[in-house]
Amino acid sequence: MAKMEDIVSLCKRRGFIYPGSDVYGGMAGTWDFGPMGVALKRKIMDAWWNYWVESREDIYGVDAAIIMNPRTWVASGHTATFSDPLVECGECHGRFRADKIADGITESVTTEEFKALNVKCPTCGKTNWGDIRQFNMMFSTHVGPVNDDSSIAYLRPETAQGIFTNYKNVVDSIYPDLPFGLAQQGKAFRNEISPRDFILRDRECSQMEIEYFVAPATWEENFEKLLEQNHKFLTEVMGLKSENIHDIEVGEKDRAHYSKRTVDIMFDYPNGQEELMGLAYRTDFDLMNIQRESGKNMEYIVKGSTERFIPHVIEPSIGVERLILAVLANAYRQEENRIVLALPEELAPYRFCVSPLLKNKPELVAKAREVYEILRNKYKNVTWDDSGNIGKRYLKQDEIGTPKCVVIDFDTLEDGTVTVRDRDTTEQIRVKPEEI
């Protein structure tokens, strides 16, 4: 597998991902997507939406506000429990997330347990640590013209609560049959103590989450179905190799406060095995808390009967940036004379690149433009490249991940055929433009 620094270099060189605010020296934990990165990100998010929402009858979309009534985060438990263990070095005063700088410990590690490990500071190498304290990761802001305690609000740390707060609206307006899901894509913000590993752990990210509402007695069968369907999405739609995907059953001590069962779907990233996505059985935790905090009835009445209950919830949740990094790592290939980003055709920023063999020959350029317009009208995501020689163009498109390069040469002027060169095999064939 590729090294992380190789992927980072490719992403900046070819316009996928840049450091956030790069012109001002950057800002830790923030990243900007360039032209190729935006195209890849959009295709990944669209593929997820098509797989989970547009291709199914039981999942519906919502798009909730980023800034919500702060009571939302009281009911969800985030104001009390959304925290990570922070430890500060007594020598250099560097601050770190305790469970990420030592092996074999969890988020619940105590000061005594941590100090007994004699962990060296990643910055100065000393072992003079202060006490561990819990650091709440929500970004706070103020709503309105007065900055006081009454105006405090938060940037959402997850998209899930926007789904839960709209559960009653959806049931009252379209009354879907159980089981049903509500899906959302959008930004989430987490004030990470130690953002690291490129886009794997950052302070601003995009999430894709589903809250799947089920009758309490059916949660186990629905959990297994969703687990299988998520694996299918990752391997068949995203093209990830199954041998790099692993299910980890999360123990009770390490589960989120709302979960009775969690499976972390792990991926073999360049820096090691990390969480790609999670599947959590949230029981009725969220709807019960909303009912208590809001005073609104969250019960679901089964159609055609008097049976009523608060549904239980199963949540598939995936970070878009984590998925993008998995797709990039899966596709990156270093060969003797070139680097190839072997993206699935449906995810590649461009499907075709059209070029004249020589850009100083007007007749070739004119014919190439004609072919370009034909393919662009047919496929949309087609690019034009006449920079440098043809060999350099091939290498550039290989790194971008373009599956096919179409070249117009002097034979095209004679017989109307063009050269189509395959990214993965480098094989070339001649066909008529209308046959592409």
Spans of features found by a protein language model:
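NTP/phosphate- and nucleic-acid-binding module
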Residues: 1-436
